[in-house]
């Protein structure tokens, strides 16, 4: 019996796959637990339509990420921070991914989730720093920071 998997089933198939499985297994397990549905011509047509719309949405997200990358890599995009500095040249407060995301939103109107900013440790020194940011699975960029003494 041919089925379309609605969810991932370990060892059998992934969501959206059309596969031939034993009839008893399909009727007694997959269909009863709503893990799959019978692969009729109508169901296969619906699946193809869904896949096309998902691909289109993914392409749109990728295009937005690439546009954001060009904005971030522009020479004029440099996030400014003015911090109080101690006698040893280190800032009193530290600059975190959350702070970077907030300042980027405030100064340039660019909204990035703080979890996408790849900061190994908080920044505590003054100067110019570049921080990697993952915008999409296929697109990554750098955020330029300019940390100055107050």
Curated annotation (Swiss-Prot):
Keywords: Ribonucleoprotein, Ribosomal protein, RNA-binding, rRNA-binding. InterPro entries: Ribosomal_bL9, Ribosomal_bL9/RNase_H1_N, Ribosomal_bL9_bac/chp, Ribosomal_bL9_C, Ribosomal_bL9_C_sf, Ribosomal_bL9_N, Ribosomal_bL9_N_sf. GO terms for biological process: translation. One of its GO terms (cellular component) is ribonucleoprotein complex. Pfam families: Ribosomal_L9_C (PF03948), Ribosomal_L9_N (PF01281). Belongs to the bacterial ribosomal protein bL9 family. Binds to the 23S rRNA. PANTHER family: 50S RIBOSOMAL PROTEIN L9. This is Large ribosomal subunit protein bL9. The lineage of its organism: Bacteria, Bacillati, Bacillota, Bacilli, Lactobacillales.
